[in-house]
């Protein structure tokens, strides 16, 4: 193992640790709240499932990183790599859709519009979110099924290519494989569009609300304005981190076609880990309950609480 491999594993390990700590913290706080009250709000449920999916995703990415360093042959071919790709694809799409559902929930709860369609969705927000979560599960299964079909076509192509019988049938299968491979990236489009729609609706709603506050000579730092800003920050950060993640995913996926194959894959893996690890802290800071518990925990760790006293996280 060379210096580059060592640095790569250290960076991946650090990102993995931060991601597990943050997402684990989210799961712990929401799980503790549910254990005490036997109830969980819709937003807490979505955040908890988002954290769980990201913990699994981080474990998959870390496993993939170890394969790049210690077992390149297994990483580039074989059933193990296909299994990792299948679990990565399913968990990845599920995580993205959970983040999208969270943005839609914030939009429906915080934004204010008089359009009948928006009001219909707002009044039935719980039912809408349940159907969105079910749709997210189905679309994640669909993207995984598309990947499995891609693997089957790839196996057929390898078999035909091995016989060195490049016929019209081979060309058709190859074109079909390339088409499915390109269309596979379109599974990312729906959550991206929905997130953008939620973001712009919140922006328009905040603009209207701010103008009303100015007309009424009211402070612009009222609770509604702050709620708008928090939701916008969470959705916007998800959008930019998602674009970074998608770019990294393409680099990691198409690394075989780049000059420095292994280095390209390493860069892609490091960038890929940044999204599930980094966005968890933005979610924590954007949620009042999680932020309060996190601050109390930091105070306790820093020794700001008196010895023997208990903060909210321990009560």
Curated annotation (Swiss-Prot):
It is found in: Membrane. It comes from the Eukaryota. Glycans are attached at residue 165. Several bitter taste receptors are expressed in a single taste receptor cell. It comes from Papio hamadryas (Hamadryas baboon). It is a multi-pass membrane protein. The chain crosses the membrane at residues 6-26, 42-62, 94-114, 128-148, 186-206, 234-254, 266-286. The lineage of its organism: Eukaryota, Metazoa, Chordata, Craniata, Vertebrata. Pfam families: TAS2R. This is Taste receptor type 2 member 3. The keyword Lipid metabolism does not apply. The keyword Transmembrane helix applies. GO terms for molecular function: bitter taste receptor activity; G protein-coupled receptor activity.
